[in-house]
Amino acid sequence: MPVMKGLLAPQNTFLDTIATRFDGTHSNFILANAQVAKGFPIVYCSDGFCELAGFARTEVMQKSCSCKFLFGVETNEQLMLQIEKSLEEKTEFKGEIMFYKKNGSPFWCLLDIVPIKNEKGDVVLFLASFKDITDTKVKITPEDKKEDKVKGRSRAGTHFDSARRRSRAVLYHISGHLQRREKNKLKINNNVFVDKPAFPEYKVSDAKKSKFILLHFSTFKAGWDWLILLATFYVAVTVPYNVCFIGNDDLSTTRSTTVSDIAVEILFIIDIILNFRTTYVSKSGQVIFEARSICIHYVTTWFIIDLIAALPFDLLYAFNVTVVSLVHLLKTVRLLRLLRLLQKLDRYSQHSTIVLTLLMSMFALLAHWMACIWYVIGKMEREDNSLLKWEVGWLHELGKRLESPYYGNNTLGGPSIRSAYIAALYFTLSSLTSVGFGNVSANTDAEKIFSICTMLIGALMHALVFGNVTAIIQRMYSRWSLYHTRTKDLKDFIRVHHLPQQLKQRMLEYFQTTWSVNNGIDSNELLKDFPDELRSDITMHLNKEILQLSLFECASRGCLRSLSLHIKTSFCAPGEYLLRQGDALQAIYFVCSGSMEVLKDSMVLAILGKGDLIGANLSIKDQVIKTNADVKALTYCDLQCIILKGLFEVLDLYPEYAHKFVEDIQHDLTYNLREGHESDVISRLSNKSMVSQSEPKGNGNINKRLPSIVEDEEEEEEGEEEEAVSLSPICTRGSSSRNKKVGSNKAYLGLSLKQLASGTVPFHSPIRVSRSNSPKTKQEIDPPNHNKRKEKNLKLQLSTLNNAGPPDLSPRIVDGIEDGNSSEESQTFDFGSERIRSEPRISPPLGDPEIGAAVLFIKAEETKQQINKLNSEVTTLTQEVSQLGKDMRNVIQLLENVLSPQQPSRFCSLHSTSVCPSRESLQTRTSWSAHQPCLHLQTGGAAYTQAQLCSSNITSDIWSVDPSSVGSSPQRTGAHEQNPADSELYHSPSLDYSPSHYQVVQEGHLQFLRCISPHSDSTLTPLQSISATLSSSVCSSSETSLHLVLPSRSEEGSFSQGTVSSFSLENLPGSWNQEGMASASTKPLENLPLEVVTSTAEVKDNKAINV
């Protein structure tokens, strides 16, 4: 196979880098998607993490990066929040935390979470490293802890720092930021001016190399190789010539080539240095850039030969060092560099011209060597027969022809060295190419033997070079010829169809890479003529990696043999898409080497590595399976694929295994590519969520139920709406101390409008309120009754108002409890959170049916969090409503003091029987009674008679009030009242008369009233619900605003001592119904007393809540 450049395409080697750096320390790490704001699902987990946690990879994938599935009872909640915060803010986290394995056993873990960025600087992944430090924790005894407290905090953190140093050294070493400094301690380079990131980036990057590393296919290296090739030819020519023709006799002659010889030796030495910094192609086809690997490779291959060839023998002559003749023979070792010529033949074998040129050069070099040998043989024959005066050697014959014979016992005279070399070369070439011409012939036995050998070599070389060059190349390099033929066809195809450069590069690279993998051999074509038995055994051996998966453990040998015939090998280059979203899935793929990523909408859903299985679960129906995501190669990947068509055929032949295979494949798939698989995932997730809500279990799950809202959208039956129900009895409200004893931390607020003339207006707004000051909920106190009450649909129906009599329009205060009979069977509002949490998940997913499982899971999590957030807001709202209820109770107590029944014959039926009331009868009561409400107002600075107070025209002048609005919106202008500390006294700054049953008390410059009515009743409390609110427009004027003073109550129902706050009704929220709203007169009330009498009114609040 021809020597190629190697695999040089840009690769995303992030996964390989992480795995390589962790190798040798601990490989417990996971990768999570940082682009998904909710959940940060795990896209890759190492085998070490699966072994540490006890979970399978399929169980870990797509779970949250916060590792909630590892939390347990003793897991620190503060660290949980810190992990969540670091993930949300995409910052680094490090700390020791207690985790729990799948079997429930705890272990201490040193957790490091690091954000990974892409080439744009965006955080796309989280790298979480897990280090088991349980053994280190166990070694710390209580005594050691006491000693640590005495000696300081430095020793207490020794185990933590040492474990962290070992763990984080791996992460920082990934980008080369780990430096070894003095005392062999590992320290972090915190130089802020360093541009390199502290951790590897998740991106496609070119192969990195040092500035001093030479590419073996670079232009400079190619030119240098040609220079070394010429120097090698020079050595191959000069070394034999100097050894045979020069010798030690004429040193002056040897000096003529000394300079060139030294220059060649210098070139060889430089070549050795460059070879230590030149890349090479490994057996797997990868280009090696690491200097250490290059050095090891060169030392174990060509270093020894190059070193011997570079020994400076010619320097001995340069310094006039006398050496023996054997030293010249050592220079022949340089001829071993000719073996490098074979590499050139491999590299340039696709160029026939270069190959023929090199072959001719080798033929000429061989003739040169044989000419040198021929001269040595003639010289030895002359020296051996010098005493016998033989003159039959080829040198004697040459001397005679050239008229320069030998004399002086054949030691002097003779032809020149130049003439002798030319004659010898002529003889060898004529002998190699033909039988010779006879002008130079062999005369002695030694010469004849050499001539025979020359003829034999000549015949072989002649046939090789001149006769059978094409045939020899086809026989020896048939695979090369096929490779070049296909390469040429591919280039012609590209040229004819005018394909773009990028597509051309992809095609050529894919062809070269696949050729390097299978060497151009089509295994199917090669094995088709073999019997099925032998072919099955061969394919089982070739595909043993995928057949060793747990998925095929239950398959019989016959099933595996049949299945192996339908397995094919595939190759994917970096950046190539194996599958695209919406494609018909034709096979199930097994990753043998390399790494891939699953993409959807440019978002990483999973990262696949060696040993991962991708495909789809099989359906009972024979239908086309569409993929729901793209599968893209990050590096060069070798794949094995099971063709689905053949798989179905095998499963039909082995039905006993088919059922098991269909069940197991959905668990063994690292990522399921079936379109619509997300619906099943969400269904399973919802079921798991419901189980976890009803029966919380697992390690460290926070089983806290949050309050929720369930909107009851069912309509009331028409008959029930029209049915008149008697008014529910109203119970007195217990004191604050009694409420504390009950300890109920859940109040249920139910509001209902009274049934007016238009009919009952039902509305449903049950709100579940949680109070934090109670130790137990009402459900915990009475579970049986709670379950009964939970099944009932609470509806408060109030009877229709009787127009004949004055209606009770007293506002009701919401305290969250409707206790009509003061019994345990009273109905309360209770709504479980399981229903609202499960209904959104059980419903079919909306939107694009091809949405990924991870996206739907994230949406489900978002919905869950939004519901929890809504529940939290509702909890806060109900607390505010409860507080508002307390304020409204105070307002109602205030209204009790100003409302009294309307009687035409007397002003106040309870305090006086006279037609015109006395001053005592104008004072408010301390408790609520069932008579009609009345309002007493004493304005400052004016005195009126009793007749004037009872006169209706005064009332109409002061208040221009619609009677329908008086009962719901009383307004009064009065002065601030104060309760003195000694008794129940109420101060009015300009009190000119004293009502009946009230005693005037003078203290200093102030006047106070004491209630002495015998009819005082404190057994009843205000109504506990209110459906009407005050209009801000009515209360906006300062002239019409009413400042009411409410004395507080004690436990016994009397007014407590102390300062009583003043409430202004203009600050209360809400609005009046326009039909019942009164327009208050803007006439100043400074000098007039006021009487406001309520009357029957039909009140309808259009803004009431319908549930």
Curated annotation (Swiss-Prot):
Protein name as it appears in the record: Voltage-gated delayed rectifier potassium channel KCNH8
Region annotation (cNMP-binding domain) ranges: 551-668
Compositional bias of kind Polar residues: 686-702, 961-972
Domain PAS: start-end pairs: 18-90
Skewed-composition ranges (Acidic residues): 710-724
GO biological process, one term: potassium ion transmembrane transport
Residues of the PAC domain: 93-145
Known partners and oligomeric status: The potassium channel is probably composed of a homo- or heterotetrameric complex of pore-forming alpha subunits that can associate with modulating beta subunits.
Motif Selectivity filter positions after renumbering to this chain: 434-439
UniProt-annotated stretches for the region Disordered: 686-742, 764-791, 818-847, 961-989
Chief localisation class: membrane
Family of the protein in this entry: Belongs to the potassium channel family. H (Eag) (TC 1.A.1.20) subfamily. Kv12.1/KCNH8 sub-subfamily.
Subcellular localization(s) per the UniProt record: Membrane
A GO molecular-function annotation: delayed rectifier potassium channel activity
Keyword line: Glycoprotein, Ion channel, Ion transport, Membrane, Potassium, Potassium channel, Potassium transport, Transmembrane, Transmembrane helix, Transport, Voltage-gated channel
Glycosylation site positions: N320, N409
GO cellular component, one term: plasma membrane
TM spans (from-to): 226-246, 256-276, 299-319, 328-348, 358-378, 449-469
Membrane topology designation: Multi-pass membrane protein
Catalytic reactions of this protein: K(+)(in) = K(+)(out)
Domain of life assignment: Eukaryota
Physiological role: Pore-forming (alpha) subunit of a voltage-gated delayed rectifier potassium channel that mediates outward-rectifying potassium currents. Elicits a slowly activating, non-inactivating and slowly deactivation outwards potassium current at depolarizating voltages from -30 mV to +50mV. Shows no obvious change in the activation rate from different holding potentials. Activation is strongly dependent on the pH of the external solution.
Keyword Transport carried by entry: yes
Record-linked Pfam families: cNMP_binding (PF00027), Ion_trans (PF00520), PAS_9 (PF13426)
Intramembrane residue segments, as ranges: 420-440
Stretches assigned to the Extracellular side: 247-255, 320-327, 379-419, 441-448
